[in-house]
């Protein structure tokens, strides 16, 4: 590989300001930053129409900026070997359970959306609490040396659990809680606005994990019935793609939880399915179903992940957090 390509790869791995994009002067850069576009990567993953609307810049100007950003970052066809190398460099966060980590291919990955869905009490929120602590660990211990954003749509966040999980890992609970940015989302519009704001917030605050617990609850409550289904799915689809762009632009792990509903047409096997239909079924890179078992035991099963084999494991929820089951 040429020195020029090596330089491009090195530059694309870190934070590069929009001011470094060829053809972007100070006045245009000011408009981009005011609209929340701080890095070249945030420009690359943006839609031209959306970027023009938010900045007030002409569409043709915006298209040229996006084109220049892509050229600067060397975004073009890659060999399968280059894709492999990029995959090997993706960050992973431990769940606290070795068996669950193995099921996930080494932990919860950056640059993708991981969905945990299941019935009430299946462990979705417990995993989210654990991940928001574990992301702060060093890479040697399964973390990313980063901070977490926790978007709570149902009021299930509990600082007491964070404290207990931090102490179990020998961490200072106050320092751990200082590194978790919490926001309560009160409706779907507020939820969408929070995610939009993260394009500015994430790079400024060393955030490596974004949690949305849960992604569908507001949409489900605000758009009931078949007459609102199309509008709900369109809005949810746009929201999920914004989360995907966030994960890819800033190399963060995005974790969403989801509820389940009964399927009256299923007479054999598991009669439940995740809320959100085809829109949510196709967007997350990894989908994990959680089920209750005896006592504090929970079962996790890979439902959809292109790089993972099908399988399931048992883990437990203890006072200290997510841990391996003795059965594993």
UniProtKB/Swiss-Prot annotation:
GO terms for biological process: DNA recombination; DNA repair. Keywords: ATP-binding, DNA damage, DNA recombination, DNA-binding, Nucleotide-binding. Signal peptide: none annotated. It comes from the Archaea. ATP binds at residues 118-125. It holds the Pfam family Rad51. GO terms for molecular function: ATP binding; ATP hydrolysis activity; ATP-dependent DNA damage sensor activity; damaged DNA binding. The keyword DNA-binding applies. SMART domains: AAA (SM00382). The keyword DNA damage applies. CDD domains: archRadA. Belongs to the eukaryotic RecA-like protein family. Involved in DNA repair and in homologous recombination. Binds and assemble on single-stranded DNA to form a nucleoprotein filament. Hydrolyzes ATP in a ssDNA-dependent manner and promotes DNA strand exchange between homologous DNA molecules. This is DNA repair and recombination protein RadA. The gene is radA.
């Amino acid at each position: 590989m040429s020195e020029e390509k090596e330089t491009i790869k090195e530059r694309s791995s870190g934070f590069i300001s929009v001011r470094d994009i060829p053809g972007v002067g100070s006045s245009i850069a000011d408009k981009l930053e005011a609209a929340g576009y701080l890095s070249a990567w945030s420009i690359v993953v943006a839609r031209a129409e959306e970027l023009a609307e938010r900045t007030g810049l002409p569409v043709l100007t915006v298209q040229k900026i996006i084109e220049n950003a892509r050229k600067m970052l060397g975004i073009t066809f890659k060999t399968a070997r280059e894709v492999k190398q990029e995959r090997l460099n993706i960050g992973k966060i431990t769940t606290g359970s070795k068996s669950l980590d193995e099921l996930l291919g080494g932990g919860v990955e950056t640059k993708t959306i991981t969905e945990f869905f299941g019935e009430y009490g299946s462990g979705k929120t417990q995993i989210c609490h654990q991940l928001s602590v574990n992301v702060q660990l060093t890479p040697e211990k399964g973390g990313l040396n980063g901070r977490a954003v926790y978007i709570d749509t149902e009021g299930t966040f509990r600082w007491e659990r964070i404290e207990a999980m931090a102490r179990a890992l020998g961490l200072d609970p106050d320092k751990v809680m200082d590194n978790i940015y919490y926001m309560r989302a009160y409706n779907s519009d507020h939820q969408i606005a929070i995610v939009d704001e993260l394009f500015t917030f994430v790079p400024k605050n060393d955030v490596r994990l974004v949690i949305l617990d849960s992604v569908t609850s507001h949409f489900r409550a605000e758009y009931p019935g078949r007459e609102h289904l199309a509008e709900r799915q369109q809005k949810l689809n746009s929201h999920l793609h914004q989360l995907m762009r966030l994960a890819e632009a800033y190399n963060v792990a995005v974790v969403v939880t989801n509820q389940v509903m009964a399927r009256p047409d299923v007479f054999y096997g598991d009669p439940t399915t995740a809320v959100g239909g085809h829109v949510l079924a196709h967007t997350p890179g990894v989908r994990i179903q959680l089920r209750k078992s005896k006592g504090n035991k929970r079962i996790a099963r890979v439902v959809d992940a292109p790089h993972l084999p099908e399988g399931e494991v048992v883990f437990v929820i203890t006072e200290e957090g997510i841990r391996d089951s003795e059965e594993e």
